[in-house]
Amino acid sequence: MTIKLHHLRPAPGSKSNKIRVGRGEGGKRGKTAGRGTKGTKARNTVRVGFEGGQMPLHMRLPKLKGFTNPFRTEYQVVNVGDIARLFPEGGAITVEDLVAKGAVRKNQLVKVLGDGELTVAVQVTVDKFTGSAKEKIAAAGGSATEL
């Protein structure tokens, strides 16, 4: 006989009914419901993060210092070496071309960094360049234009 989903049963003794506690003093677990008498554990659960009086972890760790500028502009970065690898023939390169090649995501600001070498002349038009990237593009006979 093949095993089917509706034939599966839990092993005997592996499942037991839940015990309903605190349902009257006549039953086995009435009144204090197996919690003993008085104390924090008898009344309710301890709060999240409570470590029995030990200084809790969130108070042992130092506070975060510093400042996060909410107006910071995030750029997606492309290195000069990546441009040389993706466009070996050179030519005019825009943000759309970089998106098409999978170098950056669309609808994001793009910045070209100066890591790597460039041998072909490229005319790059993106949002931002580093100084070293501009130098390398110009040295290869290309141009760097910021949007």
From Swiss-Prot:
GO molecular function, one term: rRNA binding
Key word Translocase present: no
Entry's Gene Ontology BP terms: translation
Alphabetized PROSITE patterns for the sequence: RIBOSOMAL_L15
Xref: Gene3D superfamilies: 3.100.10.10
GO cellular component: cytosolic large ribosomal subunit
Residue segments, region Disordered: 1-42
Keywords: Ribonucleoprotein, Ribosomal protein, RNA-binding, rRNA-binding
Superkingdom field: Bacteria
UniProt-listed SUPFAM superfamilies: Ribosomal proteins L15p and L18e (SSF52080)
InterPro entries: Ribosomal_uL15, Ribosomal_uL15/eL18, Ribosomal_uL15/eL18_sf, Ribosomal_uL15_bac-type, Ribosomal_uL15_CS
PANTHER family: 50S RIBOSOMAL PROTEIN L15 (PTHR12934), LARGE RIBOSOMAL SUBUNIT PROTEIN UL15M (PTHR12934:SF11)
Function: Binds to the 23S rRNA.
Subunit structure as annotated in this protein's UniProt entry: Part of the 50S ribosomal subunit.
Stated family: Belongs to the universal ribosomal protein uL15 family.
Record's protein name: Large ribosomal subunit protein uL15
Lineage start: Bacteria, Bacillati, Actinomycetota, Actinomycetes, Mycobacteriales
Name of the gene: rplO
